[in-house]
């Protein structure tokens, strides 16, 4: 028997559902400060912290819920983290477009636009043609350059969402078959008999 802990790759339906719902629950209110940070931070390089933080928040929320649901499969943790982060990206786009259209309002109902993805896509394409993002106060970036910036932002958000979900599931060992409570795990991951 190996003296190091290895995940059992156990999957439970309630764990996957709890992870997804927790990620969605973190994504909706988290989109508002994320978009506020993107709009408010004047330094373009510091804006990169926003998608990292938002993605990590959504992924960590998923991972904690999956730990509660006894998910020990890292692949499933990554898939649920990716799906929740993708939802978070969509919600952030809805909030961002609404703030672009109504800059004086920070409290609004995003559901109407969120339920119309074709309309949202048309607005995104039109926004790309006009440009909204500039580097050091220059002319707003448009076209391929802006698509690449948005793609990088999406990659950071999705990547850190997946990594945080996997890290949360991976960090916590669970003795699934140990109902007697005689096995405990030390900080090094070794099994200690009591």
Question: Model segments located where?
Answer:
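Juxtamembrane/interface segments at transmembrane-helix termini
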Residues: 94-104, 163-179
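Transmembrane alpha-helical segments of multi-pass membrane proteins
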Residues: 76-93
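Membrane-interfacial helical/loop segments at transmembrane boundaries in membrane proteins
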Residues: 97-141
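Membrane-helix interface and helix-disruption motif detector
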Residues: 34-51, 72, 144-145
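Membrane-cytosol interface motif
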Residues: 176-192
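Short, Lys/Arg-rich, polar N-terminal cytosolic tail immediately upstream
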Residues: 1-10
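Alpha-helical membrane-embedded segments
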Residues: 140-168
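Canonical alpha-helical transmembrane segments
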Residues: 50-80
């Amino acid at each position: 028997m190996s003296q190091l802990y290895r995940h059992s790759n156990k999957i439970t339906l309630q764990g996957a559902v709890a992870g997804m719902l927790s990620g969605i629950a973190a994504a909706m209110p988290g989109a508002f400060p994320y978009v506020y940070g993107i709009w408010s931070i004047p330094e373009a390089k510091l804006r990169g912290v926003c998608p990292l933080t938002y993605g990590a928040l959504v992924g960590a929320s998923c991972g904690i819920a999956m730990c509660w649901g006894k998910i020990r499969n890292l692949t499933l943790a990554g898939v649920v983290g990716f799906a929740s982060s993708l939802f978070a990206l969509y919600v952030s786009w809805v909030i961002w477009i609404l703030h672009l259209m109504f800059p004086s309002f920070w409290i609004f109902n995003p559901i109407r636009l969120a339920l119309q993805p074709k309309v949202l896509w048309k607005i995104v394409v039109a926004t790309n043609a006009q440009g909204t993002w500039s580097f050091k106060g220059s002319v707003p970036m448009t076209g391929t350059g802006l698509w690449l910036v948005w793609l990088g932002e999406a990659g950071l958000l999705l990547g850190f969402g997946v990594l945080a979900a996997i890290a949360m599931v991976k960090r916590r060992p669970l003795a699934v078959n140990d109902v007697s409570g005689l096995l405990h795990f030390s900080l090094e991951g070794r099994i200690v008999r009591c």
